[in-house]
């Protein structure tokens, strides 16, 4: 609320709508999305579920990161068909599907970290993989629009720290609300 007012008070209203929209999206992706990590820790204890919020947080972060890695590996190994060449030219259908399948299988074996039944763990794991891909390509589109190539090079061929957490901006709220709806 303060930032648009500051522009108005300066008399700098040219492009204010675009500036406000950009600010809102940045806040949505960074603050709103990532804040759901903390919400997981505040969920009440469930009878018979000893991992609590820490287990949920570990499940979410691990699956989100393993999904990114698996999509990268499967794309490198088998990738032939580009999925979004104008937005993220290295993403392939083979990488996407390999990542979804791998993440779902790994999620099934890590289901003990959640209060979910096996069918729900499978569903949630698959949806996390899809949400992670969505977050990754949306951030890629924003970076492309703003002329930003990579957010760093701490992991060769995989970008910097922000590139490691871009998927979490989508997976965190999806996971929180699915778990809350299904288990609480």
Protein language model features and the residues they cover:
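A general structural signal for short secondary-structure boundary/capping elements
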Residues: 107-108, 174-176
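Short, conserved aromatic-histidine micro-motifs
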Residues: 120-121, 165, 184
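Membrane-embedded alpha-helical bundles of polytopic integral membrane proteins
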Residues: 1-127
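Hydrophobic transmembrane alpha-helices of multi-pass small-molecule transporters
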Residues: 103-104, 164, 171, 180
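Juxtamembrane boundary at the C-terminal end of a transmembrane helix
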Residues: 177-184
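Acidic (Asp/Glu-rich) catalytic motifs at the cytosolic membrane interface
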Residues: 64-80, 93, 97, 130-172
